[in-house]
């Protein structure tokens, strides 16, 4: 349960309320098998478990999570079947009434140990969320056996070995071509061994071992984000540094979300890419700031570090403060072997402040910054407390009169523009928005990504300067309830299409 909950709420559909669904399935299956008239897993339940497990194992390897609704349904179907099967085995082994107390005690101890493993040991043992696919394999091994397909024979060793070698050969053959694998070739690499594995669905041990062999062979697979150079896992999730297949960029990926990239060409390492491209809204916002910088404090605050790409906009006379909550991100961004934006920054003073931005920002004097950039909302799981009325009041207090607030609101799952528009209207701030969604194929190959930024200010004339560019549009009228420290509703921000 903890494994599927962690994976669902970090990689597939990062939405806090989704933890309720696996818990509900867990409790429902527990109630069914321990009821007065128990409902045990029927023999065909093994097929219900193994088919989605097969699809999900392949999706785990190739990092496929779209469309989210389909994958959420598959994960819940697999977990529900696994929970019913495992709870059925527990219920069938239930002892006589005089030993029930001990039975339930040890069952609870097992739950505690499993929770401790997931929470404490798994992040130390695994760089990825591997505890989930490993438990998935174990659940498939416990699936009910049907007919005469029982026992263990040499086929249970030879077939997994053969499928593992086949997968490895397919991976190496595609990568030897030297180009980024397309959807068809990626699917073929793992779909062929997976289809061969399904013929063993009536032999749970062999089926699980074949899946395990495919998973092991996939370690050499270069995924959608390229070759992995570094992986770190902590309380905040899994961050990876990758090099794209064509060897042009280093990239920072958190879960399944890109957080920045840098050219490896020494002549172009100083170019901001991805969501921070000079031809995008980030470039427009900093050009506007530089036109009025003489009348503002020469200090810029940024909430969210990423790879430090925004540091390329710094001027020698300026001081820049990055507020970052994840120490792993700070180590990666400041390591010149991975990214050099920070070491090349032209600012007279560059500082990274570790900790929660709202708490740390309180220590800055009022009116301290000429510009404050909020770049903490591109992940699928956003820090809601940075997007409330009280948070905006804090930002306004720390920015000088006439200064700028820039919100990076690019997000695959959430439409944050109406939320920011309501906050701006409540604070009586002028603002406009640019959706940079129509980028060319050449721009994408050159490292640019689609992005959306919102700029706010007390000075309406500055916003009017931006709005002279027709790509910058006024914010929509305030609608819906205002987010505060006491109220927020992610459902109203979800992109349902």
Task: Label the model's feature ranges.
Residues 484-485:
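Acidic/polar residues in short coil/turn loops that connect beta-strands
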């Amino acid at each position: 349960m903890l494994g599927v909950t962690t994976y669902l709420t970090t990689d597939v559909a990062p939405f806090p309320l989704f933890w309720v669904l696996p818990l509900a399935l867990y409790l429902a299956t527990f109630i069914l098998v321990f009821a007065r008239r128990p409902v045990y897993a029927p023999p065909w339940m093994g097929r219900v478990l193994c088919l989605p497990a097969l699809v999900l194992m392949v999706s785990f390897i190739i990092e496929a999570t779209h469309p989210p609704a389909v994958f959420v349904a598959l994960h819940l179907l697999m977990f529900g079947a696994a929970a019913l099967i495992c709870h059925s085995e527990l219920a069938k082994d239930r002892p006589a009434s005089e030993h029930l107390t001990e039975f339930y005690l040890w069952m609870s101890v097992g739950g505690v140990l499993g929770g401790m493993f997931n929470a404490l040991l798994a992040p130390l043992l695994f760089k990825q969320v591997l505890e989930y696919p490993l438990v998935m394999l174990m659940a498939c091994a416990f699936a009910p056996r049907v007919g005469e397909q029982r026992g263990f024979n040499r086929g249970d060793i030879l077939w997994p070995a053969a499928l593992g070698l086949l997968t490895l050969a397919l991976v190496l053959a595609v990568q030897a071509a030297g180009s980024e694998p397309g959807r068809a070739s990626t699917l073929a690499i793992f779909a062929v061994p997976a289809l061969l594995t399904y013929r063993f669905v009536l032999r749970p041990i062999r089926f699980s071992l074949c899946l395990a062999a495919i998973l092991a062979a996939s370690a050499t697979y270069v995924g959608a984000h390229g070759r992995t150079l570094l992986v770190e896992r902590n309380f905040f999730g899994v961050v990876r540094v990758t090099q794209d297949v064509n060897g042009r960029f280093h990239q920072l990926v958190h879960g399944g979300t890109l957080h920045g990239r840098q050219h490896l060409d020494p002549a172009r390492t100083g170019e901001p890419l991805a969501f921070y491209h000079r031809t995008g809204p980030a470039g427009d916002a900093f050009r506007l700031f530089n036109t009025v910088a003489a009348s503002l404090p020469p200090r810029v605050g940024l909430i969210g570090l990423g790879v430090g790409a925004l540091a390329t906009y710094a001027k020698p006379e300026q001081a820049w403060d990055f507020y970052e909550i994840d120490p792993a991100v700070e180590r990666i961004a400041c390591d010149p072997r991975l990214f050099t934006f920070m070491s090349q920054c032209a600012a007279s003073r560059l500082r990274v402040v570790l900790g929660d931005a709202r708490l740390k920002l309180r220590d800055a004097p009022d009116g301290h910054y000429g510009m404050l950039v909020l770049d903490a909302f591109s992940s699928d799981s956003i820090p809601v407390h940075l997007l409330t009325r009280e948070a905006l009041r804090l930002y306004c207090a720390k920015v000088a009169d006439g200064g700028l607030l820039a919100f990076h609101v690019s997000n695959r799952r959430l439409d944050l523009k109406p939320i920011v528009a309501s906050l701006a209207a409540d604070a009586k701030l002028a603002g406009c928005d640019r959706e940079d969604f129509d980028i060319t194929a050449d721009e994408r190959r050159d490292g640019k990504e689609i992005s959306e930024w919102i700029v706010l200010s007390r000075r309406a004339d500055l916003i009017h300067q931006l709005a002279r560019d027709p790509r910058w549009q006024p914010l929509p009228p305030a609608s819906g309830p205002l987010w505060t420290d006491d109220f927020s509703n992610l459902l109203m921000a979800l992109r349902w299409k």
